[in-house]
């Protein structure tokens, strides 16, 4: 292939069954106008389309500061309980409300717009997730889109009616789950759910609430500003989604910090919540990015179903409300560690999804890797996902690699033969001066938080706040009725020495797989090590943290999330334990609350230091230097 940029036109003849697609394509910018398969090889962040700004870059700062909500007790802010876990917020016309944290929101009067989607007042509670590690979308007051505006206020709060009647929009904000307290285990992420130096109101302690109102622009919080270009494309794609009688498959391609996940989140929200009367149609979300997943467990890929009535708004850090249909454990945040394992898992997941013959809308979230092996991942995903819509996100119009090959047409059971619609959008500009507080929220730290949240999750969607070393582990046997096989992805099982297996497992995160039958194993001590893991049919169920192993009793003690442990207890299966490269959060091995009073008490951690000159001496032979001669 030459280095010329591949171009595609939207008016090429296609299958007769795709008449509606040809009509809608006229609304899109085609690649005959803008090249889409290009030679991207840079990190220029000077674009200015959709901005994830810090507070100092808030658009129209003077105007917005006047519109930014600031609470005043007994005027536009009312507490509903002695515990202050519920508050009423009154907004004037077009006023912006910025909230960090995890909370539930009910629109008592009027309406709101959130990410350019309108929501009417009603008794429904919406679940919001606004961590400070991501740009926060403002909640903007709006009107009631209906014949007659109503006041959706419970009986016990009717005495507030006269105090709130003069406001255009009235909201009830209540506490969410206690995930905001979980950051206390990770000191470097202690302000992940909002700046610590901001107090809500006099008399209300920060620990009383799972959310925090931002009443003053700060460089500790980024604000999401959606560009006109993005809004136009999102609206046009929503029309296609609403009017299509066939399936729709969306794939977004972009590098790191390109806004790929943000755009897909906005599209999902627009598709599911555009109408005030929520439909029962769900969206399928295929998440094959093990490093920064949207829905998958840590270092895994998954196929999920997102329902419009229960969908979580904002960045839920894989803790929102959704249904997982299928998942595969990768064992690493990078597909490059075991490329064959990753490719096989992706292909298996997409094939299982294809058999569903889903006629709705599906999204594919791929890694933000557009060079080297990342190009192979993109091409592999294109071949198997067969998208109807492909969006390229580039910085300042910089081209992508010419090795990304988009087929001229795809063929599926649902659509026969069709030509993909290809769009190119600009990525958001990244602030050149990011505050020290925001610099801590890198991908590795967020992965550690997700692993911690996963392991601490309870059945009722709350979280265990104390370190796991202070909890009682669950007991599982090693043998025919428990764990029937061990697999180590990093090492060859045949090269393992049985005395080293216990040490290599203590205090590590492992994956539990359900096996259909007893695998072919080789016993090394008490450990049944798999001979050929790829030949046995297993199903990934979830992650666990190993507390300890009793070699004499052939028992293994593990911390298993409460919601997962109930499922394991209800079924009698054979289990295979897989160890990858997943790192255990340091807060699980050595909590910062001072529970270990002396060095002797600390498990998993060796404080031994070699004495001076205590090391292995290696004699160097035949080292030839200038002036040296062999005799």
Swiss-Prot record:
SUPFAM superfamilies: P-loop containing nucleoside triphosphate hydrolases (SSF52540)
Pfam families per record: CLP1_P (PF16575)
Coiled coil start-end: none
Region annotation (Disordered) ranges: 1-65
Residues bound to ATP: 254-261
Gene3D superfamilies according to UniProt: P-loop containing nucleotide triphosphate hydrolases
E.C. code: 2.7.1.-
InterPro entries named in the record: Clp1/Grc3, CLP1_P, P-loop_NTPase
Subcellular location: Nucleus, Nucleolus
One Gene Ontology term of the molecular function aspect: ATP binding
Zinc in keyword set: no
GO biological process: cleavage in ITS2 between 5.8S rRNA and LSU-rRNA of tricistronic rRNA transcript (SSU-rRNA, 5.8S rRNA, LSU-rRNA); rRNA processing
Biased composition (Basic and acidic residues): 19-30
Thylakoid is among the record's keywords: no
Disulfide-linked positions: none
Enzyme type, top EC level: transferase
Highest taxon of the lineage: Eukaryota
Entry's family note: Belongs to the Clp1 family. NOL9/GRC3 subfamily.
Protein purpose: Polynucleotide 5'-kinase involved in rRNA processing.
Protein name per UniProt: Polynucleotide 5'-hydroxyl-kinase GRC3
Organism: Kluyveromyces lactis (strain ATCC 8585 / CBS 2359 / DSM 70799 / NBRC 1267 / NRRL Y-1140 / WM37)
Species lineage: Eukaryota, Fungi, Dikarya, Ascomycota, Saccharomycotina
Gene: GRC3
